[in-house]
Amino acid sequence: MSQTAAADAPKPLDPQLGGAAIAPPPTIPDPSTLILRLLTPAEKEASWITNSVSWAGRLTQTDYFAREAANEASRLLRNGGIRFWGLTTEKEGGEIYAAVETLKKRVLVQTSKGFDVEDAYGIASVYTPAKYRGNGLAGTMMRKLGEWLDTEEANCRFSVLFSDVK
């Protein structure tokens, strides 16, 4: 093989970098074409795999999953108290471009006549996979979530965003 042909030949993949290191940048659809919808159980677990890279800390992936499942089953969150959302396409099983959780709580709201019991939502675990960051997807997702919170279905008196970003 000539030196020119050798120089033009594909380089073997570096096992430390893997295929993703040489893959072209991901194609990101126009954010206005994406929808916010509840994730299926399989999609929820896929989002846990994705965000565990940033959030598991010293936990193994198995321990991270166990913690998330325990949180979901806790008395405060079971029976629909937590919802897992994804910014994605219409179809189930499509790419999840960003994800977020909502935690529904009954709260006391003081009024001039006393107290009312209302629904409120905590917004937590806002996450965009690294390959999609910097494209406004989290902002799009939060706008769409805000629109849902304003619906009669949500019946949301107010919401609060939880963040551990330092």
What is each PLM-predicted segment?
Residues 2-98, 104, 112-115, 122:
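Short amphipathic alpha-helix that is part of the acyltransferase structural core
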Residues 101-107, 141:
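Acidic, serine/threonine-rich, low-complexity C-terminal transcriptional regulatory domains
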Residues 105-107, 126-128, 163-166:
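An acidic- and aromatic-residue-enriched active-site/binding cleft used to recognize and process polar
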Residues 109-113, 148, 158:
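Catalytic micro-motifs at enzyme active sites that drive phosphoryl/nucleotidyl and oxygen chemistry
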Residues 118-120, 158:
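Beta-strand-rich binding-surface signature
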Residues 125-128, 133-150:
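Conserved acetyl-CoA-binding loop-helix of GNAT-fold acetyltransferases
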Residues 142, 149-164:
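Conserved GNAT acetyl-CoA-binding A-motif
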